[in-house]
Amino acid sequence: MAKGKENRIVITLECTEAKKEGVPVSRYTTTKNKKNTTERLILKKYNPNLKRHTEHKEIK
């Protein structure tokens, strides 16, 4: 039998550089496995307000 999907959770990623620049923040949603990745996720994603790739960190 297949295992359940209780280890995957939906998280929100928010741009860190947009707050410093004074423009609206960009947010992305994704999933992560909370068993394998216990610390907060940091990914490089595109911010359409800044028109460049920036660091996005996981928020609560």
UniProtKB/Swiss-Prot annotation:
<dbReference type="Pfam" id="PF00471">
    <property type="entry name" value="Ribosomal_L33"/>
</dbReference>
<comment type="similarity">
    <text>Belongs to the bacterial ribosomal protein bL33 family.</text>
</comment>
<dbReference type="GO" id="GO:0005737">
    <property type="term" value="C:cytoplasm"/>
</dbReference>
<dbReference type="GO" id="GO:0003735">
    <property type="term" value="F:structural constituent of ribosome"/>
</dbReference>
<dbReference type="InterPro" id="IPR038584">
    <property type="entry name" value="Ribosomal_bL33_sf"/>
</dbReference>
<keyword id="KW-0689">Ribosomal protein</keyword>
<dbReference type="GO" id="GO:0005840">
    <property type="term" value="C:ribosome"/>
</dbReference>
<dbReference type="InterPro" id="IPR001705">
    <property type="entry name" value="Ribosomal_bL33"/>
</dbReference>
<protein>
    <recommendedName>
        <fullName>Large ribosomal subunit protein bL33</fullName>
    </recommendedName>
</protein>
<dbReference type="GO" id="GO:1990904">
    <property type="term" value="C:ribonucleoprotein complex"/>
</dbReference>
<dbReference type="InterPro" id="IPR011332">
    <property type="entry name" value="Ribosomal_zn-bd"/>
</dbReference>
<keyword id="KW-0687">Ribonucleoprotein</keyword>
<dbReference type="GO" id="GO:0006412">
    <property type="term" value="P:translation"/>
</dbReference>
